[in-house]
């Protein structure tokens, strides 16, 4: 199909460019995010000191802002780097980890969205509902089970409305992913349930999306490519480790991202127009 050819072409562009992806992220998943960026074909840098973030983002091809482990210093760095990236037309990707869990976390996420132009926002259904002003509960940094059962039609409406509000690509990832920019929306049904058994699967997905954004000017195409790549890699990794456990799966996930081929998308892709 044409859509899988586009995804593979985006992957080839990424590998050829080897974009530098600047992360201001959390210290729980930082190593996995760095490794998956390397595996997909980009280069990671995890600089968050306020004295260098503007210089670092100036040489990057994309910036990830991940609010998983907030503190005063990194919050200041997020605003500085995000605004500098906007000045230089460098895409900024937001991962609003656990938004809704505390008032502080929610206020920071909303302030970031108000002061920085984000190209992409990726979160689970509970996080996106909070950003949309809806009532939602998060279980720490995970989506609540009742949010996960929301009809796909509601997720599509959320993506469209939040995309209009922030003029950004919105990605809701979960059992069924919804990715869209305004009226152009796709659903993706790739992935494995064991991805919920490792910490950082969502963070890694955001890093893969950012890697594509660093080489692909169409950020909807980049986001779709990132989500599909993670989902297919998750399926392959599960097949290789289904008799083992989550730790083996995590290693196999990074290996599977590294080994993605054109046939991976053509044979396994489950992308649908919404």
From Swiss-Prot:
Names of the cofactor(s): Mg(2+)
Keywords: ATP-binding, Kinase, Magnesium, Metal-binding, Nucleotide-binding, Thiamine biosynthesis, Transferase
Database matches in CDD domains: THZ_kinase
Family annotation (InterPro entries): Hyethyz_kinase, Ribokinase-like
Binding site for substrate: 46, 200
GO MF annotation list: ATP binding; hydroxyethylthiazole kinase activity; magnesium ion binding
The UniProt record lists the keyword ATP-binding: yes
Associated pathway: Cofactor biosynthesis; thiamine diphosphate biosynthesis; 4-methyl-5-(2-phosphoethyl)-thiazole from 5-(2-hydroxyethyl)-4-methylthiazole: step 1/1
Swiss-Prot/TrEMBL catalytic activity: 5-(2-hydroxyethyl)-4-methylthiazole + ATP = 4-methyl-5-(2-phosphooxyethyl)-thiazole + ADP + H(+)
Ribonucleoprotein recorded as keyword: no
E.C. code: 2.7.1.50
Residue positions binding ATP: 122, 173
Biological process according to GO: thiamine biosynthetic process; thiamine diphosphate biosynthetic process
Task performed by this protein: Catalyzes the phosphorylation of the hydroxyl group of 4-methyl-5-beta-hydroxyethylthiazole (THZ).
Family of this protein: Belongs to the Thz kinase family.
Identification of the protein by name: Hydroxyethylthiazole kinase
Species annotation: Clostridium tetani (strain Massachusetts / E88)
